A protein has these predicted regions:
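Flexible propeptides and autoinhibitory/regulatory segments associated with cysteine proteases
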Residues: 1-7
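Histidine-anchored nucleotide/phosphate-binding helix
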Residues: 18-28, 160-163
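A short, glycine/small-residue-rich beta-strand->loop->alpha-helix junction that serves as a flexible
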Residues: 8-18
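A structural signal for short, well-ordered beta-strand segments and their strand-loop junctions
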Residues: 6, 33-38, 136-138, 173-175, ...
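Tryptophan-centric aromatic hotspots in well-structured domains and transmembrane helices
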Residues: 18, 142, 158-161, 180-186, ...
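Catalytic phosphate/metal-binding cores of nucleic-acid and nucleotide-processing enzymes, i.e., regions
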Residues: 3, 23, 27, 123, ...
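Secretory-pathway luminal glycosyltransferase catalytic domains
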Residues: 3, 39-169, 252, 259, ...
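Donor-binding and catalytic core of enzymes assembling or modifying cell-surface/extracellular glycoconjugates
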Residues: 13, 166-251
């Protein structure tokens, strides 16, 4: 076949979902088959697409290898439409905007949403999830310390301000790679500290009613997969630090409450 579409899957889980979503949308747009290779790129952040073949990527078609594909590279960081070639095409880039699958939101959400089996299991494990105003808080610290001038870290002041925007909540679910820091700096009465595989944490996060997210594609996808029509989502106004891309406006969603934050020495507050 000479009309296939594929993409390089690279980065963490959130990055890879963006890349796959863009490829799938191009396939639907041009009525072409989309295939993926589990190890199509040198992994960053220690994430292999093969980790997700049986869960988040269970609805994708994987093949052992692809040959004869022409690479089409993403343009500037902000959204810019890129078109597949008339023959086999592999997209290369990050494609971090829902504009890359505009018109196919429902299909994309269905493709990557939690399985019914997972939902049943997680409600049994965390019955608090069924409460009316559950809140997820994502606090990313560990890997950001290596390059805070690229990936700045949202501190406790940001979380406290975001809590004021959220208002009332019944139970908090904390998702963090530094739970000890959270316990020392933020106090909650009804709280669960989630510690599980990354894809399970993302899915569990998506089942919370409301979200305090950070500048992370991981929490981006958790909020997108949330089907609560009245969900509240708070995000920081700064996504990258001074050494990162600055034209990132297209990653923001219209239904977010964007909290104006300040950048100082790698911190967002």
């Amino acid at each position: 076949m000479n009309n296939l579409i594929s993409c390089n899957l690279m980065g963490g889980l959130g990055n890879q979902i963006f890349q796959a979503a863009h490829a799938l949308a191009e396939g639907m747009k041009y009525n072409r088959e989309v295939v993926f290779v589990p190890q199509s790129w040198t992994p960053m952040q220690g994430r292999q697409a093969s980790n997700y073949v049986n869960n988040v990527f269970r609805n994708l078609k994987f093949v052992d290898s692809i040959d004869g594909f022409e690479k089409v590279t993403e343009g500037p960081w902000e959204y810019s439409d890129v078109f597949p070639k008339d023959h086999n095409t592999v997209f290369d880039g990050y494609f971090q905007s829902s504009k890359n699958f505009l018109g196919f939101d429902d299909e994309i959400r269905k493709t990557f949403s939690p399985s019914e089996e997972f939902i049943t299991e997680v409600y049994e494990k965390y019955p608090e999830l069924k409460q009316e105003n559950t809140l997820s808080i994502h606090i990313r610290r560990g890997d950001c310390f290596m390059n805070p001038d690229i990936h700045p870290i949202a501190n406790e002041k940001y979380v406290e301000r975001a809590l004021n925007e959220i208002g009332e909540y019944t139970h908090v679910f904390i998702f963090s790679d530094d739970k000890n820091w959270v316990k020392e700096n933020l106090k909650f009465e009804n709280v669960t500290y989630v510690d599980d595989e990354d894809y399970k944490e993302m899915w569990l996060m998506s089942l919370c009613k409301n979200h305090i997210m950070v500048n992370s594609t991981f929490s981006w996808w958790a909020t997108f997969l949330n089907t609560n029509a009245n969900k509240k989502i708070v995000a920081p106004s700064i996504w990258f630090g001074p050494r990162g891309p600055q034209n990132y406006k297209d990653i923001y969603e219209s239904n977010w409450t964007v909290l104006d934050v300040k950048y100082e020495d790698g911190w967002l507050s």
